[in-house]
């Protein structure tokens, strides 16, 4: 019964966010995976909230309106919206329609350097529209369909298959971005190096979060931390 409620409504309590404290949502990953997947058919709106996991939204039928970072985006069928970790957003649903909504553990995928670097480009959100990028949108949507099939199945090695599909989803997006920005990557090597080192720093902190940390312990962090503090100081003075 719980699986059917999750599949139909995206919640075991239709019409509300399950674990919401003020504007903070705690995502309950189910079935021992690092994702929470909804095939949502509700006409209920979701108030302003945020959560540590990232989020992917893609309408199947009808539109879906998301307000994030001061912008309101109306998604059309097979558009794909990626919302970065920690971003405040609200959702307005139409009277009818269906859509995929998926939360994913950022820390789980941050263990892979490629993914950590890619996730740094998601802030505050990334939008792929079928009108502007039909091939990319269709590829990403097809992977979401496969994830749904595994998530609500009883297949053995389901978790492994879901994680493989998630990596495939992000790899498709990342390779597309790399092709689109290849000239920019060559023009701005310093920024790319900072992004790579920042991803390494995030991964190091994630892997040693129970230890006493300092920049002296991990020398590569020294220059990067100084760069970040200088940038923050300039913004503060401005």
Language-model-detected regions and their locations in the chain:
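N-terminal regulatory/effector-sensing and dimerization cores
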Residues: 31-123, 153-160
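Basic/polar phosphate-binding segments, predominantly the helix-turn-helix DNA-binding elements
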Residues: 178, 200, 204-238
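N-terminal positioning helix adjacent to the helix-turn-helix/winged-helix DNA-binding module
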Residues: 136-139, 190-201, 237
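A hydrophobic/aromatic-rich effector-binding and dimerization subdomain
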Residues: 2-36, 88-152, 171-184
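Residue-level recognition of alpha-helical structural elements
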Residues: 136, 154-162, 194, 211
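Regular secondary-structure segments
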Residues: 60, 141-155, 202, 206-209
């Amino acid at each position: 019964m719980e699986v059917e409620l999750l599949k139909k409504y995206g919640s075991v309590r239709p019409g509300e966010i399950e674990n919401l404290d003020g504007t903070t949502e705690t995502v309950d990953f189910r079935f021992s995976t690092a994702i929470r997947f909804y095939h949502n058919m509700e006409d209920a709106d979701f108030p302003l909230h945020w959560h540590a996991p990232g989020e992917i939204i893609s309408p199947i039928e009808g539109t879906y309106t998301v307000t994030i970072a001061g912008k309101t985006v109306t998604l059309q069928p097979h558009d794909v919206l990626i919302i970065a970790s920690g971003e405040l957003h609200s959702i307005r649903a139409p009277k009818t329609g269906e859509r995929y909504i998926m939360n994913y553990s950022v820390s789980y995928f941050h263990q892979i350097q490629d993914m950590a670097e890619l996730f740094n480009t998601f802030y505050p959100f990334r939008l792929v529209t079928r009108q502007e990028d039909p091939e990319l949108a269709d590829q990403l949507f097809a992977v979401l369909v496969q994830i749904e099939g595994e998530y609500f199945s009883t297949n053995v090695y389901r978790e492994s298959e879901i994680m493989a599909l998630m990596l495939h989803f992000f790899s498709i997006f990342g390779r597309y971005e790399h092709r689109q920005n290849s000239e920019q990557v060559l023009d701005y090597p310093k920024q790319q190096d900072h992004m790579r080192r920042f991803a390494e720093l995030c991964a190091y902190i994630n892997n040693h979060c129970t230890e006493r940390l300092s920049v002296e312990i991990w020398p590569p962090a020294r220059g990067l931390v100084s760069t970040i503090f200088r940038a923050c100081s300039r913004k503060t003075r401005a």
